């Protein structure tokens, strides 16, 4: 039997609030679905974040219904779990994945202490019995604290020929944010294939307990950081085509899908930067220009890019520090506040978004950080970077301020002391704290995170 593994489509995403970016994401999704249909798969697995928002835009929902309906008409089974963008944030809210299930389009898998069998679905394809086990996204701390129950509940089905586990979590080495990384030791063992989501760049190198745990990535790059690899080449985009037989996994390969190429990162440097920029910008592109040692202002660089045909332009200046020659004297102390204020001004111009936080607040926070660094006691940065960029508060901060949903009263042993990880994961001190919290009757229920 054949399975398509996709993730992180983010229908409804619009970089810098540009309609063209929203359309690019949808158009690439249409091409992705056409490729999936051409591969004649038996099942499509969506490993989270089909949508950008828990309450998706009408056009995004309509397109998903249209394309998934076409697959269902072809006889394709669709199995999905919710990513962090689709998790309900208040009691009584409904995930868009649940809406698709109610329409008969997908099998929505998630773990709930009230409905313990919702995480598993078994079907037979061409004589191959397959059991899918799906878990909605959990913040790292929630995943680690519940590791033992997850490992117990998500054991492979011994009666199945193939077991596929679906997770929306980040493994070590996939993203730089350590607060999101979950070590493989916390995941259940024994599955033939781990269909992963949450990481936007494709990767097939990851393993969980010796089995493949690949990430298909986002079909359309969502940020400038996702456009090119370290060699400057465009990153591949697409999905994984996986083949199983009654003996388990046969093979899996990455199927490329053409994306818009609308986003571009252009690096220019030196005195001839203007000529180089005009040559490399294509009409209609949304460009991030990294200008190294040009001596130009952001406004000058942006003007040239727009004249060359760019639709929008974000500028990043990189200037080498000029060394002070022996005998030179400075005219006084650095005006840190002035430097920061100018940086905030440029950051706001570069993001092209409206920000309600006053400049004075951002400057004061930045000065406080610098004072802490100087005292060798840096404060918690929190959402400072997001404030400057005009981003909403992080999910972590939203989670901490949210009242957890009430538990259904079912007692589940959630101690995690049997799970061993390397030192780069959660510390032993942190593990013991987690263990002490989990025995209390007032623990938050996993139902809080139902997608």
Curated annotation (Swiss-Prot):
Superkingdom: Archaea
Gene Ontology molecular-function annotations: 3'-5' exonuclease activity; DNA end binding; endonuclease activity; manganese ion binding; Y-form DNA binding
InterPro entries tied to this protein: Calcineurin-like_PHP_ApaH, DNA_Repair-Maintenance_Comp, Metallo-depent_PP-like, Mre11_archaea-type, Mre11_N
Binding site for Mn(2+) 2: 49, 84, 168, 198
Keywords: DNA damage, DNA repair, Endonuclease, Exonuclease, Hydrolase, Manganese, Metal-binding, Nuclease
Residues binding Mn(2+) 1, per UniProt: 8, 10, 49, 200
SUPFAM superfamilies membership: Metallo-dependent phosphatases
Enzyme class: hydrolase
Region of interest called Disordered, as start-end residue ranges on this chain: 374-451
Active site: 85
EC nos: 3.1.-.-
Cysteines engaged in disulfide bonds, as pairs: none
Co-factor binding details: Binds 2 manganese ions per subunit.
Cofactor field: Mn(2+)
One GO biological process term: double-strand break repair
Similarity comment text for this entry: Belongs to the MRE11/RAD32 family.
Subunit: Homodimer. Forms a heterotetramer composed of two Mre11 subunits and two Rad50 subunits.
UniProt name for this protein: DNA double-strand break repair protein Mre11
Organism: Methanopyrus kandleri (strain AV19 / DSM 6324 / JCM 9639 / NBRC 100938)
